[in-house]
Swiss-Prot record:
GO terms for cellular component: cytosol; endoplasmic reticulum; endosome membrane; PAS complex; presynaptic endosome. Scaffold protein component of the PI(3,5)P2 regulatory complex which regulates both the synthesis and turnover of phosphatidylinositol 3,5-bisphosphate (PtdIns(3,5)P2). Pentamerizes into a star-shaped structure and nucleates the assembly of the complex. The pentamer binds a single copy each of PIKFYVE and FIG4 and coordinates both PIKfyve kinase activity and FIG4 phosphatase activity, being required to maintain normal levels of phosphatidylinositol 3-phosphate (PtdIns(3)P) and phosphatidylinositol 5-phosphate (PtdIns(5)P). The keyword Acetylation applies. InterPro entries: ARM-like (IPR011989), ARM-type_fold (IPR016024), Vac14 (IPR026825), VAC14_Fig4p-bd (IPR021841). This is Protein VAC14 homolog. One of its GO terms (molecular function) is identical protein binding.
């Protein structure tokens, strides 16, 4: 520093002392400056006051010499003390050089800067609030200072500033929020602690409504919640808890829509604390905001559904996620199925962008788990649609929801509980919004069929419920069963389309007397037949599924849908099946279900007597397909008490190729005759006179069997049949003889028998072609 330079009104002694390396001498100089400035204040000499401050600032505080800078800092503090209440007029000039020293490399100098600013702020009190942002900015840097003394000094200044803000009603929150939003993304734990402490203070001040600006800082708060420091995480939990308490207290003023996507992101993070907290917030948002959250359903489901499959290690997250899922599902109502009103161009332009609710920070999406479904939605969170205003009607966007559900159902790595939840959602949507959901049915259908192969019975049951709802919903009824379900869907018609003309031929085979095979129950729609076709195609391509789950699936469908329609339609389809071996296997499966399942009790009773035209039509329809398997055809005749026709069929067995499989099925039929299902048949053996063809049919089966356990069983049963002469009483002899049950006049049994012969001939030809025997149709017994 140039000693010859004029520093007036500062005296040479003051200048010399300010430059001294000893603190005590600089302190003496500060007292002299304080006295000098007081005199200027008394004289109202603002020019000299400004000159003193400028000199201390430019020549000392911003000097290249460290001791001069220290002197300048203590001098500026002395000026502030001398100015007292008038210091507010000069705060900019007093504060700026001190804040510059906050960046000094010398830790002692940074400490003196803290001390000087503390004295300046202490005198000015509320007058410093217009300069709050620069003070906060400087303090946020010192909070992370490596020197403990500097940090201690900054904490004293920080507490003073908090007291001033707390007692003042003039704090500029609007001007402060941008700085807070920027600083909240700091990764330094001390800076984070500083930020959190300030938010806690601001939340506690009644006159400051920080809740209005929560969307600006919520993302940053959740990132701080993942800090490694236990104390910081605890502080952040307290802050978030206070905010949530305020939200519950006054939900009408909360900007739920602007924070929804932020929660969606943090509900997917790998940090358990962040995920649990975000999920708890999401639960409260859904319950408090209600349908305002519906436009964000796809994002919420993306976050919530995977959590439902968590194990006990994350039980808390799983439980909260389940509540979120259930609450969100309840928000969907039938009114969401109403047609969407077309939007004008002006409305589309004024709609907010969902990305606007996210802070524009690089770290926004950090920590989010990249799920297997992310690729379906592009980048970021842009797929979710934001609610425009609270007054505007809330629209449920099914496209995004269905895409998320389809994605999770397609993912084979996803947990069982998640898959069940997805299926529950689909079922719920088909119940509440069937018209809109049927636009997506063609895209959902393949994955729903594929889900039938799931390892979990519970998943398969829910899947069948969805498929049954699709097949029975009135919304699925279309004039053209092959028409696409939506204008913009890519549909694989080879799987679902059933041409109208082809279907008519399929349902009404030529030369069929009194036969109508088209399911006509009003609860069935055009998708019912598509479902049956695709289900049989699935069984055909996945024989293991048919073997392991076929009976289970069909029995459940008989409970969920009309059993008669299921058997009717499957018989129709199998009638045209080109794979004869599969047709035979499928008929055997259906027959076993028909004869043994409790779910088919009513259908068995309907077929038992063939009293109605409908039951006769059903019998004819089943019979034509049952012809793919000779033994099942006989069992169907036993069930329907067509004993004469059963006997005629057994007579035809002499012309068939008797194989081990054939004899095994005869064996099983004999075992079945001993079951409760055929109790009525066994009782009819007491009336041999009126049931001669029953006896002949059973003896025919006996003659087909080799000397096996089944042979012994049936033989013993027939030996128990009493002599009809011994059973006749005097009343019976006097009474007119009863005629046996006659064949129904509406059924052409001759034509049915011809059909049986035709089908069996086709089977024989196919078997011989496979074995390389060509047209050599000699009968061969394989034992």
């Amino acid at each position: 520093m140039n000693p010859e330079k004029d520093f007036a009104p500062l005296t040479p002694n003051i200048v010399r002392a300010l430059n001294d390396k000893l603190y005590e001498k600089r302190k003496v100089a500060a007292l002299e400056i304080e006295k000098l400035v007081r005199d200027f204040v008394a004289q109202n000499n603002t020019v000299q006051i400004k000159h003193v401050i400028q000199t201390l600032s430019q020549e000392f505080a911003l000097s290249q010499h460290p001791h001069s800078r220290k002197g300048g800092l203590i001098g500026l503090a002395a000026c502030s003390i001398a100015l007292g209440k008038d210091s507010g007029l000069y705060l900019k000039e007093l504060i700026e050089p001190v804040l510059t020293c906050f960046n000094d490399a010398d830790s002692r100098l940074r400490y003196y800067a803290c001390e000087a600013l503390y004295n300046i702020v202490k005198v000015a009190r509320g007058a410093v609030l217009p300069h709050f942002n620069v003070l906060f900015d400087g303090l946020s840097k010192l909070a992370a200072d490596p020197d403990p003394n500097v940090k201690s000094g900054s904490e004293l200044l920080d507490r003073l500033l908090k007291d001033i803000v707390t007692e003042s009603s003039k704090f500029d929150l609007v001007g402060f929020i941008p700085l807070l939003r920027e600083r909240i993304y700091s990764n330094n734990q001390y800076a984070r602690q500083f930020i959190i402490s300030w938010i806690l203070v601001l939340v506690s001040v009644p006159d400051i409504n920080l809740l209005d600006y929560l969307p600006e800082i919520l993302d940053g708060l959740f990132q701080i919640l993942g800090d490694n420091g236990k104390e910081i995480r605890k502080m952040c939990e307290v802050v978030l808890g206070e905010f949530l308490k305020e939200i519950k207290k006054n939900p009408s003023s909360v900007k739920f829509a602007e924070m929804a996507n932020i929660l969606v992101i943090h509900c997917q993070t790998t940090d358990d604390l962040i995920q649990l907290t975000a999920m708890c917030w999401m639960r409260e948002f859904i319950q408090l905001a209600g349908r305002v959250m519906l436009p964000y359903s796809s994002g919420i489901l993306t976050a919530v559904l995977p959590c439902l499959a968590y194990d006990d290690r994350k039980k808390s997250i799983k439980e909260v996620a389940n509540v979120c899922n259930q609450s969100l599902m309840k928000l969907v109502t039938p009114e969401d199925d109403e047609p969407d009103e077309p939007k004008s161009v002006a409305q589309k332009q004024t709609e907010p962008n969902p990305e606007d609710s996210l802070p524009k920070q690089e770290g926004t999406a950090s920590g989010g788990a990249s799920g297997p479904c992310d690729s379906s939605f592009g980048s970021g969170i842009s797929v979710f649609t934001s609610a425009s205003t609270d007054r505007a009607p809330v629209t449920l966007h099914l496209d995004g929801i269905v895409q998320v559900l389809n994605c999770h159902l397609s993912d084979t790595t996803i947990g069982m509980m998640t898959r069940i939840a997805v299926l529950k959602w689909l079922y719920h949507l088909y119940i509440k919004t069937p018209r809109k959901m049927f636009r997506h049915t063609d895209s959902l259908f393949p994955i729903l069929l594929q889900t039938l192969s799931d390892e979990s019975d519970e998943v398969v049951l829910k899947d069948l419920e969805v498929l049954a709802e699709i097949a029975s919903s009135p919304a699925g009824q279309t004039d053209d069963p092959g028409a696409p379900d939506g204008p913009d869907l890519q549909v694989n018609h080879s799987e679902l389309q059933v041409p109208t003309s082809g279907r008519a031929n399929l349902l009404n085979p030529p030369n069929t007397k009194g036969l109508e095979c088209s399911p006509s129950t009003p609860t069935m729609n055009s998708y019912f037949y598509k479902f049956m076709i695709n289900l049989l195609q699935t069984f055909s391509s996945e024989r293991k599924l048919l073997e392991a789950r076929g009976p289970f699936i069909i029995r459940q469908l008989c409970l969920l849908l009309n059993a008669e329609n299921i058997f009717h339609s499957m018989a129709d389809i199998l009638l045209r099946e080109e794979d004869l071996k599969f047709a035979s296997t499928m008929v055997h499966t259906l027959n076993t279900i028909l004869l043994t399942s409790t779910e088919l009790f009513q259908l068995r009773n309907q077929l038992k007597d063939l009293k109605t035209l409908e039951s006769q039509n059903l019998f004819c329809c089943l019979y034509r397909s049952w012809c793919h398997n000779p033994v099942t055809t006989v069992s169907l005749c036993f069930l329907t008490q067509n004993y004469r026709h059963a006997y005629d069929l057994i007579q035809k067995f002499g012309d068939l190729e008797v194989t081990v499989d054939f004899l095994t099925e005869v064996d099983k039929l004999v075992q079945l005759i001993e079951c409760p299902i055929f109790t009525y048949l066994r009782l009819q053996l007491l009336d041999v006179k009126n049931n001669p063809y029953l006896m002949k049919a059973l003896y025919g089966l006996l003659m087909l069997l080799p000397q096996s356990s089944a042979f012994q069983l049936l033989s013993h049963r027939l030996q128990c049949v009493p002599n009809p002469e011994l059973l006749q009483t005097e009343d019976c002899l006097k009474a007119a003889p009863k005629s046996q049950k006659g064949d129904s006049p509406s059924i052409d049994y001759t034509e049915l028998l011809q059909h049986f012969e035709k089908v069996q001939k086709q089977h024989l030809e196919v078997r011989h072609q496979r074995s390389g025997r060509g047209d050599h149709l000699d009968r061969r017994v394989v034992l």
